[in-house]
């Protein structure tokens, strides 16, 4: 009966460990920083286009 809590704790620990498959990356995976940089570039382009056509938004 004393082994039951130990067994339950081990099961919980095993379930919380990330699997090996979750950490493997495919060829087309990009780091998160590049997505952030792309979003910033898109925002800057939209702002520059807006300011080019409409002076009020600058």
Swiss-Prot record:
Kindly indicate where the leader peptide sits in this chain. 1-22
Top-rank taxon of the source lineage equals Eukaryota
Subcellular location(s): the record lists: Secreted
Query: Which residues would be cut away as propeptide?
Result: 23-46
**The keyword Disulfide bond belongs to this UniProt entry's keyword annotation:** yes
Q: Which UniProt keywords apply?
A: Cleavage on pair of basic residues, Disulfide bond, Secreted, Signal, Toxin
Swiss-Prot/TrEMBL domain comment: The cysteine framework is V (CC-CC).
Q: How does it assemble?
A: Homodimer; disulfide-linked.
State the family it belongs to. Answer: Belongs to the conotoxin T superfamily.
Which is an annotated Pfam family here?
Chi-conotoxin
Tissue specificity, per the record, is: Expressed by the venom duct.
Spell out the molecular function terms from Gene Ontology. toxin activity
Name of the protein: Conotoxin TxXIIIA
* Predominant subcellular localization, coarse grouping: secreted
Q: Name one GO cellular component term.
A: extracellular region
Q: How is it modified after translation?
A: 5 disulfide bonds are present in each homodimer: two intrachain disulfide bonds per subunit, and one interchain disulfide bond linking the two subunits.
Membrane-spanning residues: none
> Has keyword Disulfide bond?
yes
